[in-house]
Amino acid sequence: MKRFSDLNQIDISKLEVFFQPAKKTKKQTVVFAHGFSVFHSYFQSFYKTLTDYDYYAPLWPGHNVNGFDYKELSPIHYGELLAAFIENKDLENIVLIGHSMGAAVCSYAMNLLNAKRVEKLILLAPLSYCNLLRYFKIKSSFKKDKAERMANFKAMFQTKFSNLTDENSWENELSKHSKMAKKLSNNILKELPVLNKTYKNLKLPVFLVLAQNDLFMPTKLTLSYFNKYLIKNNNLQSSVILNSEHQMFNSKYESFCKAMDDILNHNKLSKIY
């Protein structure tokens, strides 16, 4: 796709965004960038606790409800959409959170945004070159037996397809989603050099949260890589959530909430939770 430097040129008219308004006096605005092959609701165990924050979660093409064009399946394009959305809504005082692929999307968006809009960036199990060391494990996820793939798909997308009742409809949606995911994974590999480089440009406070038992990335190497090579402006705090998996907000909910409370309310992060 054509790349844009002027955010006004980016069409966000079809971008679907989930919004949860603050129930109390708003502290800040949280914007969440979801990861690969998921629906935004996989983060709901945590975002439902954000009663003091306006909460936005854009749905990237391929993961949204109302259809997409295959040329839109691009993390770089998602970053452009994210930046254009924030500028268009004139959002300020933002806590920007990205999980997995979404972390790289956030990092790319920061290169396009007015940096003063975002107060802190939270990277949850971020996509980087380190993921290549788990490439074959990631690839094998596409080759699980049909029953397992269907069970995982239903668990992740039940909210999106709540109207589906028969198995044939579910199988049709899974087939379409699998085709999308393979195309997007190929584009992630193509765009990874650009995405990886954007982390080096981050100047705002950054909080890196990793899962101890992450199947999609080598946790210790990722921790070292970000601290030694990617973010070297003394603006990075990092932590590992013990006994957690890639979606640490679901596998170790209480520990994750403690880490997020420290970040959101105290601007600090312990080494482990």
Swiss-Prot record:
GO molecular function: carboxylic ester hydrolase activity
InterPro entries, per the entry: AB_hydrolase_1 (IPR000073), AB_hydrolase_fold (IPR029058)
SUPFAM superfamilies: alpha/beta-Hydrolases (SSF53474)
Origin: domain of life: Bacteria
Metal-binding found in the keyword field: no
Residues annotated as catalytic: 34, 100 (charge relay system)
Pfam families: Abhydrolase_6
Keyword Hydrolase: yes
PANTHER family xref list: PUMMELIG, ISOFORM A, RE40534P-RELATED
Similarity comment text for this entry: Belongs to the lipase/esterase LIP3/BchO family.
Annotated protein name in UniProt: Putative esterase/lipase 3
